[in-house]
Amino acid sequence: MKKNIALMALTGILTLASCGQNGTGTTPTADACATANTCSVTVNISGVSSADFDVTMDGKTTSMTLSNGQKLPVAKTGTVTLTPKAKDGYTTPAAQSTTISSTNLTPSVNFAYTTVPSTGNGNGNGGTTPTQPFTLNITSPTNGAAATTGTPIRVVFTSSVALSSATCKIGNSAAVNAQVSSTGGYCDVTPTTAGGGLITVTGTANGQTVSSTVTVDVKAPVVDNRYGTVTPAGDQELTLTNEGIVKDADNGWRRLGQGVSTPSDPNGNVDIYVKGTVNFSVNAAAGSKVEVFLARTTGSDVPTNDDVQAGDVLRSVASTSGTETFSLDSRRLAEFDGVRKWIVVRINGTQVTYQPVIADNKGPQQPDPELNGVQNAYSNILNNYNNSGLTYVRGDVNVFTGNPSLQDREFGQAPLGSSFVQRRPSGFESIRYYLVPETAFGNKALQESDEMLRAKAIKSVATVVSAPVLEPGTVKATSFSRVIGSGATSTVTPKAQDNVTYRVYAISRDQLGNETASATYELVRFDNVGPTITGSVIRDTSDLPFASQEPERCLSDIATITLGGITDNAGGVGLNPGQGLTFTLGGRQIQAGQFDTNQLADGEYTIGFNSLTDALGNPVVSAPTNAKVYIDNTDPTVNFNRAVMQGTFASGERVSVESDASDGGCGVYETRLFWDTDNGVVDDATTTPAIGHPVQFARQRVTDGAKADSLNAGWNALQLPNGAGAVYLRALVVDRAGNATISTTPIVVNAKITNQARPLLGGFDAFKRNASAQFMSNSNAISGVNGTAVTPNTTANSALDNILSLDSVGTLTTNAYLPRGATETAITEKIRNVGAYGRFDATQWNRIRDYQLNTDPTLRSAYVNAGNLANQRGNNWRIRTPWVELGSSDTANTQQKFDFNSDLLNDFYFGRTFGNNDNVNLFSYDQFNGIVSGTAGAYSFYGETVQK
C-alpha cells in the first residue's frame, strides 16, 4: 500500500508542474532569443588555435576569425552556417549548419584540423615525410551531453596508437593525468561553471601530440528550496589524489553510483557513502521543529512511518537559525555496513524528506602477497633459499597478489525480507605493497589481529612503498603486480636497501579508503654486492741486490705469493656452492710460495682470477690487494757526461761531474757518485796511505718514478801529498724494483805544488747515543779498539731506537801546512772539509757483489743476453765496500770540530722493517769513519770498527 501512496504523490507533483508551465491565452509569442537574450553558437576547434570562417545567417555572409571555444552571439532564432576557409598546412573541414530554437538557444559546432604531410622540399630532391599523426577520439560524453557543476564527468577516449601520456581538462581548469592503455584511456573532470563546457583530451605518442574535444551542457544543480534538504559537510568529501586513489581520512563521505537496485538505469543510482563520523546540515524555517532519524527499510524505496518511528533519533530541536547540523556516527550500526539506510528529516511533524546513505567502515578482502623474478640480466631470485624461509633477491623483484579476484566485503546484514542486492559496499579500489625493515619487526602493532589496525601499523613503519595498483593487469598469475628495485643497476623506483631483511605486506583498499592488511607476509632480503677476495697478495721478497721500493707493484727476481680466500659481503646470500678460487699471472696459474719472476718477460701484468659469483650471481667486487704488478728484471743504465775520461786535474781543483741514468721498467730510484783510488779489488782492507774504498760525494733520489735522472755534482779533487795517479769516478744507480748498475770513468789527479803534507788529526770516537765520547789519538788507519767499542743491540727483534742510534765526534783537526820559503810568511792552504762516513757492512756487500756476479737468477733468464750481462757486471762490480756519506762540513778555517749523528742501519735500507738480526745486518754499517781534507787536496782519514 505504501508504494501506491508514493506513486500518487509523485503524479500529483508532475501534474502541478505541468499546470504551472502551460497557459491557454492568445498572446503572441516573442522570439526566444529576444526573450532570453542569451543566444549564441559555440565554435570548438581542434588541431589549431584559431581559423577563418564565412558565417551566413538570413542570407547574409560575414568573414571573421574565430578562436577555439569562442561564443558567437546571435540575435534571433534561425539557422547559422559556418564555412571554414583554407588554412596552409592543414586539411579544410566541411561546412556545418546549426539551428537556434527555443529548445536549443546555445548550440555548438566542432571543426577538426589535421596536418597535411609534406611530399617534397620544392627543389626536386624529395623531402622528409613526417610521422603520420595518430587519431584520438572522445567516445563519452558526447557533444551536448548534460552535466552538473560540481559533479565529476568520466571521460572515455580511444586512440589509434598506444599513448605514452594523456591529460584531460574542462574549460580553463587545470589539466589532470589520464589513465592510458594500448587503445585509449579515461579520466575524470569536474565542471565548476555553468554553460558550454569544452572538454579537451590531449594525448602524446611517438613524439606527437593530438587533441580531441567535445562540449557538454553544464548546468548548476537544481536547488531544492524546500525545507528538509540534507547536505553533507563539504570539507569531509573524500576526493581523489593525483595517484587516482581516494585520500586518506578516518571520517568522510563520497557519492558513488553502484547501479545495483535499478538495473534499467544503473548510472543514475548514486548514493552517499559514509565512513566514520560525518557532519550534515538540514535547512528549516526558523522556529520549526526539526527531527532527524536514521531509518531502515526492506527495499530501495523510502521508509514508512513505522520505519521512521523505529529508527534512531539523530537530532530533535526547535530551529532558530534556519539551518541545523547533526553528526552521523556510521559505526553505530556496524552490522548494517554496506546496506542502504535513510536519513529522515521531519519538520513540524508533517513535512518529511529522505536522504539515503550507505555506511562502509570495513576494508576489502585480504590480499596474499607473493614474489617472483624479473626477466633482465642483472636480476635473480632465490625463493626459500636453503629452507631458510627467506627469499634472496638481486636487482628487481615482482610483487603481486596470489588471489586476484579481490572484492569489497559485504559485511552488512540485510534486513529481514530484503534481497541480496541490498548489500552494496563501496567497492574495491586498489592494492599497494609495503616493505617493513627488520628494525621494525619488534613492533607489537604488526601483530594486531584487527586487519585494519594492522594496516595502519604497517604504513607507519614501512620504508619502501609501491605505487597503488588499480587494475589487476592482463597476466592472471601475477595480478596487481608492482616491481621493487634494488642495486645501482636497477632503474626502478622505489628501491630497497642491500643487506636488509624486509617483510613484504600487501594492503587492499576500497573506494572510501578503508584498508585491509594481508594476513601473511613474504620475507625478502636484497643483495647486490658480490664476494671479496681477501688476503691475496704477491710481493717482491728479494732484497738483492737492493730492496724494491714498491714491493707489491715492482717485482724483480724472487716474489712471494700469498693466496687468500673469498668471502661474501656481511649479510649476503653466500658464495656460489662448488666454486673455487684460482689465480693466474701472465697466463700461468700460480700457487702459493716463492715465484721466480724471470720466468716472465719484463712488463706490466694483471693478476687474474676465475669468474666467481655469489649464489645470486653478483660478481667479485674487489680484486687482489695488488691487482697489477710490474716485473722488472732489467738493470738500469748510467753514463758519465762529465768528467772527461782520463781528464787531468790538480788536487784541490773542483771537478764537475754529471751522470745520466735511465730505467725502462719501474723507473729510476736513486743515483750515488763515488771517488775511488783502487780498481778491480774485492778484498775489504783499508789500505794506507790511500783509503782504497769508493767514497760517496753526491746522491740524488727520484720520488716520482721517472724513467730518467740526471745528477750534476762537484768533487774537490783529492790526492796524497806530492802524489799523482788515477782516481775512479763511479756512479751507482738503483731502480725502483731494486736492480742496480755501476758505471766507472777514470781521471788523473796530480798533487798541487802546495800539497806537501796531510792535515793533522784530532781525537775521534763513535759511541752510543747518550753515552760519553772517549777520544784517543788517531792515525791514517781504522782501529777496532780506538775508544769505546760501538756494540749495537739487536736482540729480541729490537726496533730502531736510541739504543741503535750513534754519535760520532771529532775534536780539533789542525792544518799541517807550513809557510814555504822566505817570501811566504803565512799559511796559504786551509782545512776545507770534514766529512763523516759509514762503511757498508763488508759481509753484506760481498753478498750483493756475489749475487750480481754469480747467483742472480736473471743471469740464467731466457729473456736477457746472459753472456753480455755477466761480462758487464764483471767489469763494474769488482770494487771494495763503499763508504756512505753521513754528512760533511765545509770550512775555510785552519781547524774544525765536527759532530755527526747516524744509526746502525745504513741509508740503503730504504725504509723496510726488520724482525731479526740478519735483516738488521743486511743493510748496516760495520765502520764509522771520517775524512779531513784541505784546500790543496791533501787528506787524512780515521775511524772505528763496529763490534757485533
Swiss-Prot record:
GO (cellular component) term, any one: extracellular region
Keywords for the protein's UniProt record, in alphabetical order: Cell wall, Cell wall biogenesis/degradation, Disulfide bond, Glycoprotein, Lipoprotein, S-layer, Secreted, Signal
Cellular localisation: Secreted, Cell wall, S-layer
Cell wall biogenesis/degradation in keyword set: yes
Disulfide bonds: 168-187, 554-666
GO biological process terms, semicolon-separated: cell wall organization
Range of residues in the leader sequence: 1-17
Glycoprotein found in the keyword field: yes
UniProt PTM: Glycosylated. Contains tightly bound reducing sugars (six per polypeptide chain) and fatty acids (covalently bound and located in the N-terminal region).
Additional record remark: The hydrophilic C-terminal region rich in aromatic AA could be engaged in interactions with nucleic acids, and the bound fatty acids and the N-terminal region could serve to anchor the layer to the outer membrane of D.radiodurans. HPI layer contain about 30% beta structure and virtually no alpha helix.
Primary role: Shape maintenance, possible protection from noxious enzymes or exogenous and unsettling DNA, and may mediate homotypic cell-cell contacts.
Name of the molecule in the record: Hexagonally packed intermediate-layer surface protein
Organism of derivation: Deinococcus radiodurans (strain ATCC 13939 / DSM 20539 / JCM 16871 / CCUG 27074 / LMG 4051 / NBRC 15346 / NCIMB 9279 / VKM B-1422 / R1)
